[in-house]
Amino acid sequence: MQIEDFDFHLPEELIAQTPLKDRTSSRLCVLDKQTSEITHRSFKDITTYLQAGDCLVLNDTKVLPARLYGVKSDTGAKIEVLLLHQQEEDTWEVLVKPAKKVKVGTEIIFGNGKLKATCIDLKDHGGRIMTFSYTGIFYEILDQLGEMPLPPYIKEQLPEQDRYQTVYAKEKGSAAAPTAGLHFTDKLLEDIKAMGVNIVFVTLHVGLGTFRPVSVDSVEDHDMHSEFYSMSESAAKTLNEAKAAGRRIISVGTTSTRTLETIVRDHDGKFVATRGWTDIFIYPPYKFRAIDGLITNFHLPKSTLIMMISALAGKEAILHAYNEAVKEEYRFFSFGDAMLIL
């Protein structure tokens, strides 16, 4: 299967640069995966498509203000550091720019010495392992000095940091938001719960690999990035009960989907309390074992995410829906509109 098979024409002006004022006022493209029928709604109408007994699975990861600007302690040269994931308490894998200026032993100072980092190892593609030193609480210092690492296709400044955060974000660790969840408000979640829908949380820390372009011609040759995930005992119990009773599991976002599909793949079709790293790569003709439906945003052409949803609804149906969305001038990508595949 070729990467080109997942291409579509997207006018640049349809890439949403800022979030809408009201989270639930996004548009919703509903795709019936059995009939390929498309319906255009507003996101606040999502309750129309949910029913008592459904499980709605949300990713409660929290985006770190992971972009830091510092200077080398010896030369004063400016260095940008992007936190990727924590290895030990004060040791992180990071991306640095310009990479050639950061070698083993290089010390970088942030915020007039409030935070310091020393490079202890080199990785590929500008990656480094760094240990951090500071006085106080690391995440509080990060809140003061760091910036939200917005996706590369967003050129505008973010007016409010919390608009790149879901209202239920809790577990710190992501370099990017699980953007399908940005459409929910506390009120909408309360309304959904009042319908008898089970709200279930899992965690997957979104890495920058989610934005990495596919650089091979053949889908099967792509080397998928890894991300850390976890599921609690109570989440596993609720989901297993739903599956056993034939009730629907609807995941919010491709990150929740990666988590659920990884767990049932690795545990004989069951949900279990677990944590680990997943590099699952979902593309046609993958057969989903965990989910019955998916709420997601509109993805980049030729991306691994459009491949995933093509496995769920069929490539032709997805590309037809995307072409319809372009024609209807939907807003695309992280701050854009949503799609429900059911």
Swiss-Prot record:
Keyword match Cytoplasm: yes
Localization: Cytoplasm
GO molecular function list: S-adenosylmethionine:tRNA ribosyltransferase-isomerase activity
Entry EC no(s): 2.4.99.17
GO CC annotations on file: cytoplasm
UniProt-listed InterPro entries: QueA, QueA_dom1, QueA_dom2, QueA_sf
Keywords: Cytoplasm, Queuosine biosynthesis, S-adenosyl-L-methionine, Transferase
Pathway note: tRNA modification; tRNA-queuosine biosynthesis
Main location: cytoplasm
Catalytic reaction equation(s): 7-aminomethyl-7-carbaguanosine(34) in tRNA + S-adenosyl-L-methionine = epoxyqueuosine(34) in tRNA + adenine + L-methionine + 2 H(+)
Entry's transmembrane regions: none
Family: Belongs to the QueA family.
Subunit structure: Monomer.
Protein name (database record): S-adenosylmethionine:tRNA ribosyltransferase-isomerase
Organism in which the protein naturally occurs: Oceanobacillus iheyensis (strain DSM 14371 / CIP 107618 / JCM 11309 / KCTC 3954 / HTE831)
